[in-house]
Amino acid sequence: MNRLRIVVMSLVLLFAMSCGNRTGESYEARLRGNVVLVQMEEYHPAFRNTMKGWREFFAPGIDPKRDIYPYPYGTMNKEYMQWNMMENVKSDGVDKVISYSNHRWEGVEDMNMKIIPRAFLVWIEPWHGGKPKNPDNPDDLNGWHWPSDMQPEDAPYKNVPGEWTCYLEKKDSLTPIRGGYFAPEFNERVTAFVKKLGQAWDNDPRVAFVEMGIIGEWGEHHDPDITTFWPPHDEPEHVYGRTWIDGIDKVLGDAFSEAFKNKKVMVRYAYDFKDYDFGIYWDSWAIDEEVERGYRQMLSLGDRWKTQPIGGEITWNWGSLYLQGNRCLEDCLKNEKTFDLILEQIRNLHCNHLGGVTWADWSDSLFLERAGELQKAMGHRFVLSEAGYTASAKVGKPIHLEFAVTNTGSSPFYYSWPLEVSLLDPETHDKVYAHVIEEVDITQWLPGEEWDVHAGAYRKPAPANKISCDFIPDNLKPGRYVIALSILDPAGMLPSVRFANTNYFTGGRTPLGYVWVGEKAGDPNVDIAQFADLQNDTTLKYTLE
């Protein structure tokens, strides 16, 4: 360790100790010899941040597409993708998947939005009262989306008119479902289809995570089930060839593991796919009837959340949430007991994102406040506390930088995106030099563990991650520059994931202070009047090239 590095580390420690009663309460940069010591203030409100928090859903052809930047928190959309729109016959190539994806996801990169696609076959089964696809809406999700050259389901179930329930006539007590998921060719066909999805989506920068889907209504892995671990919905016990698809867990587990080497794959239930390292989408958060099937089964996965995303949605149209009188997300969050339960589950399960927010009334002040609290809790929240760096470096000589960052959220960021230190023009804030800190893996910036409900904090606090690097600015004129940090989206190498600090520049960078190259150091403080509000910045984007 060189002398400059030792000096910087010692001064950062002394600075933090001297500011112990005000840590995080203000931004300040101090010059100590040839070292700048920076104390930073946390940005306390919630804000939108890449691949975390409230997740949206818009019914294609029904809900109007966004034509403005999402407000206040959206960075991800759920997209239900009909199988037959991506492959209508076996011979259709991956180009059809790409073409339909482009149609459905047009323009999301300009709003810095990511997609969570879920391929599916059936929206609601006819024996549950499902209605067919609207012929006037080519993208309608309703109905049954079997490829034209695949035999659809022929099931013995009968719908009870006007109700979401079905029955079997006595003569059909052992009658299996024919065709569809149970067709002899289905396993081979679905394996080939998943391979095409991987070819289309595994390197698509628009895709955040991939929900496995395909099986069951909405692709939620029930009706029929993946395994017999849990009783079926429609019958008191499992019946071979009707209530679950024997062996499909291995077929789909192998297919998705092979097709997706880059994107994280999520499945519906924690008790299925035991031999695979998948994330989970639990679509019934905070419902009493799902405590064992959902919540406790997910807890049993242990540290799975450290490498795989945990998400889902809040659904208030059934179970305890409905019986309590909840008819919208606002009702759920404005009920203090329900809000506390959701927050506790987010923290204990290390939740990355939740849906159910699309139609919310953001003018409701209490709802906005509580939605913000959950936004802060979900996913990653990287807070810089202090930093130290070389104040003045001779031309062609290294600048040493070190800083500390803590993840006060509930989950990691799941992809190892580049962490960049840059030098900016002090007037325009344009980047004039950049260095990617290769040794850093931001997926290892982990949150705390073991949530204490009464203390409102993790019993094992999140560790402070100490980062240091040296870089030599090339071809820079002598002068003053702003030294800044940012986490880049590899799609365009533009700032994307943001630090939760008040010292923020429009465009995604976090300025630490001034640094001098080939000149004597002066006042390192950046005027706080230059700082922008994190939540109000609508300039972030990525590229598809």
Predicted regions and their residues:
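Bacterial N-terminal signal peptides that target proteins for export
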Residues: 1-8
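C-terminal motif of bacterial Sec signal peptides marking the signal peptidase cleavage site
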Residues: 15-18
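Catalytic-core regions of glycoside hydrolase
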Residues: 28-65, 109-113, 209-360
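Aromatic-lined substrate-binding rim segments of carbohydrate-active enzymes
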Residues: 66-168, 189, 245-263
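Conserved, mostly hydrophobic/aromatic
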Residues: 77, 197, 210, 256, ...
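Active-site groove signature of glycoside hydrolases
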Residues: 153-186, 193-238
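Catalytic cores of secreted or luminal carbohydrate-active enzymes
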Residues: 338-390
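Extracellular/luminal regions of secreted and cell-surface proteins that mediate adhesion/ECM remodeling
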Residues: 376-545
